[in-house]
């Protein structure tokens, strides 16, 4: 044995063991807290074909969007963006699949999704980890023959825009934007408190002109 090697101090070894024990306990505690932390709920507002120039938070002097402005003030507002295809249904399929139009499309018809490209959508991934998912609003994505959108959500309620104002059972008219929100509120009313949820509210009114030109209808009515 080499007598020149220093002997380890029992005090130092004991102290080191205590430090390692404390660090290990802290790591296990933090890891357990993170594992037990509830996943965030997701509310996805998608305004179809809406340009930033029609939002108050981007400086429009006339259009009133107070709720969107409030979300922008509390969150992140992007000043630059890029899309691979400036077509409404391509952007929707890109969001659902995570693939660009050139990636998911059928040869010779790039805006039509291939079956294998849309076999599993992002709501399917959320469902696998315990989320309850809902879809309300405009669908209109070019999917392959036999594709069923309702199979990819726990609750699926498409709402179209022709006409924008829908006649209700009591004879009154209700705008499709309000109906989309109504469906989402009903979804939340049936939601279990211990389960995370993901709601997709895909609005359609900003996509095209409202053909209902009766005076006094809507926030910006025809004269």
Q: Which positions does each model-derived feature cover?
A:
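Bacterial N-terminal signal peptides that target proteins for export
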Residues: 2-23
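Formylglycine-dependent sulfatase
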Residues: 24-27, 31-223
């Amino acid at each position: 044995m080499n007598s020149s090697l220093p002997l380890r101090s029992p005090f130092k070894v004991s102290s080191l063991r205590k430090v390692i024990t404390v660090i290990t306990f802290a790591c296990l505690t933090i890891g357990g807290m993170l594992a037990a932390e509830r996943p965030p709920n997701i509310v996805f507002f998608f305004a179809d074909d809406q340009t930033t120039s029609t939002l108050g938070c981007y400086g429009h002097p006339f259009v009133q969007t107070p709720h969107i402005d409030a979300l922008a003030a509390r969150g992140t507002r992007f000043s630059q963006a890029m899309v691979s295809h400036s077509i409404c249904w391509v952007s929707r399929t890109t969001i659902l699949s995570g693939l660009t139009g050139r990636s998911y499309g059928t040869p010779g018809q790039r805006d039509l999704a291939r079956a294998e490209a849309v076999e599993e959508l992002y709501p399917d991934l959320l469902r696998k980890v315990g989320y309850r998912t809902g879809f309300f609003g405009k669908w209109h994505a070019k999917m392959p023959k036999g594709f069923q959108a309702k199979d990819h959500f726990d609750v699926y309620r498409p709402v179209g825009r022709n006409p924008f104002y829908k006649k209700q059972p009591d004879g009154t008219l209700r705008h499709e934007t309000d109906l989309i929100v109504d469906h989402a509120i009903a979804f939340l009313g049936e939601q279990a408190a211990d389960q995370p949820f993901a709601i997709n509210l895909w609005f359609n009114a900003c996509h095209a002109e409202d053909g209902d030109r009766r005076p006094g209808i809507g926030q910006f009515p025809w004269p």
